[in-house]
């Protein structure tokens, strides 16, 4: 089977979608021919030593918000199944036009007003046959939204993690260290983080750490430290000795960062977005704070802080339960399901 995976950003952008592609393509390439195709948009650095073909095309715009990926045509000629991220305006028509079989991957909620307008036009007027394509969702919640729209060829397969790479370390009991991966812009909630951190400055033993691209705010509170853009090994090492993950995000489908932190035994305080709740379920190790509610985010943080400070055994139990949640998403369980999805689509016609 010959497979192509398309996404707009360069793989070096290194967010959840890019991580998903690299892991999936590496796994599938053991048995199948795999091409990954992206544009050079958001390229951070060159990538070497990949065990699949990586093709980078020039990022172009048609007009307005629409992207031009017409160059992709020549690379899809001999492909049996094309997997394309659904989020990019203007890309779906050419994917449908040049592909034999298509799976559209839904890795973003698409709930913004402009997205709702575009996809309503696309699905109901411009390209109605898109409902007859296969669609991959990360959560039952998001899949149900599309079932109500008339989509029937649906796969639900969650994100995954290489559990053996993420090992819990002995937790610190001198400082309560809170990791905030990717909380660098408004969508991820940096404004909320700043307000929360300022409110908690009276606690000398609470510290916040940000990883990822440079935050949009230059002057952060004294109890917030920016650690920079880390490679995978550095990132795992950093999160493993933290005590809590805090993610006040405003939009999320299935955050890899939550999965990674659960795997190293960190309890989580995250916004109560329906996709996230659907992804992980209700557990004592995860606190779903009311979206945009500074007070409730603080409530969640202080809940785990008090347990950490006053009841070490209970905190260790929560840490162990966090790891147990992550174990359900081990790549050894999920990656074969993704391969099976491709096989079913390949054999469908």
Residue ranges and their predicted role:
Residues 7-15, 22-23, 27-64, 272:
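N-terminal strand-loop element at the rim of the active site
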Residues 84-90, 106:
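Short His-centered aromatic/hydrophobic patch
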Residues 117-135, 149:
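Membrane-proximal helix-turn-helix segments that form the acceptor-binding/catalytic region
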Residues 136, 171-188, 194-197:
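Conserved donor-binding/catalytic core segment of Leloir-type glycosyltransferases
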Residues 141, 160:
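Carbohydrate-associated surface elements
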Residues 229, 283-295, 304-309:
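Conserved acidic donor-binding segment of nucleotide-sugar-dependent glycosyltransferases
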Residues 250:
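Aromatic "clamp/platform" in nucleotide-sugar-dependent glycosyltransferases that forms part
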Residues 267-270, 277:
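Short hydrophobic beta-strand element within catalytic cores of glycosyltransferases
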